[in-house]
Amino acid sequence: MTFEPISRRSFVKFAGAGALATAAPGAFAQETDANPSVTKRGKFAYQEETRARRLAWWEAARFGMFIHYGLYSIIGQQEWAMESEGIPIPQYQLLAEHLKPKPDFAREWARLAKRAGQKYMVLTTKHHEGFCLWDTKLTNYNAMQQGPKRDLVREFVDAARAEGLRIGFYYSLMDWHHPDGAICKTDLEARKRFVAYTFGLLRELLTNYGKIDILWYDVDWPLTPEEWDADRMNRMVFELQPDIIVNNRNGLDGDFSTPEHKIKAAHRAWESCETMNLGWGYQRADHEFKSPRILLNDLTTCAQQGGNFLLNIGPEPDGTVPPEEVSILETMGRWLDTNGEAIYGTQGGASISFGNYDNFTRKGNTLYIHVYFWPSGTPAAQWLKFFRPPTVVAVGGLNAKVLSARVLKTGQRVEFTQDEISLRLTGLPEQAPDEPITVIACECDRPPVVNHHRIRPLWPRYGVGMPG
């Protein structure tokens, strides 16, 4: 039996009525049908024909930073506090005057992402609470007119660019603060105003900050793609940012899928988003952090299956990243400094099965074996020659012939034997050469695929399962 936790983003409850926000009913009146060549809902010629080119850098990057930061960070009880706790909007919006990140917060985030080996950053420019972190002209509920009196998105963009990182904007379509957000499903005029407001905010984000690489929609409730005018929304996005990639959370397929709190390969580009503890936004009392080994295993599993890993930080109210998160990311970064070739630019399909203590990635004809539990000291070695000498890493069902093998951390050459059933890497030390995961690179005679199921038809040749 498997259990998948309910995602907060997929479990959306009814939002309460909103306080006034300065909407702009005509904000999108000038938008035209930029590309009428729609082939079916959400798919039009430009997006389809350019997808592979636009995705190329992202698929090579494999690892990104997600940042949840907003008014909820002040409360310190995760990002859904406003709705989960039923905080009245007139009270909640008072938090805006108290959001005052330190001057260098964005540079700290970007430098941390760089040290962690992450290649792109995605910031919550507006979460469900409706507060805009940029200098928008469409509502006074923003960071330029309240609280910090600064354009935090501008600071984020400048910091990311200074570190050579790609830039992503998260944008929540759902809005608990806007007065039309709660009634747009049933009130046609409210819907027109709210959709125009949404288009206007997106237009600002994609016009005022130079080249943007990713648009990360979230929660299209309560409207359908038709009610959002999502086809036209995406066409506007590509008109403003021709090289951008968009996800699948405005009701359309977009360019990539976004499994949350799980690793689930799709038959297309995909990215798994995950937290280090139990929440996305800052939670003061949550110290249940995953280990670097678990998170690196998640990263390698994503790469093994051809996907990306978007790992979240939840900064404190002043923008400081919690020390536990800094430590985890720096550990991951040190590992990637040595083992990055086994992650960046790898292709999916290295394995259609999982090892007892290892994962697999591949690049060309190279198989990377990620050993997260070092298999030394098994007592079975005293009875089974298979496990001698002391440490053996064994891979069953490899389709390719191995030509050479080496430990990435040390460059040490690894001895091996191979037959139809398994590859045995021998002469390895008692202690793992690297922490928290040791990677062994095997040069093969063809693109390698590990498939343990290939072994079953071969067992009878070894006298297994045959009548005695």
Regions found by a protein language model. Name each.
Residues 2-4, 10-29:
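N-terminal export signals
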Residues 8-9, 241:
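Short, cationic motifs built from Arg/Lys/His that form the positively charged side of catalytic pockets
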Residues 16, 31-468:
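Mature catalytic domains of secreted/periplasmic carbohydrate-active enzymes
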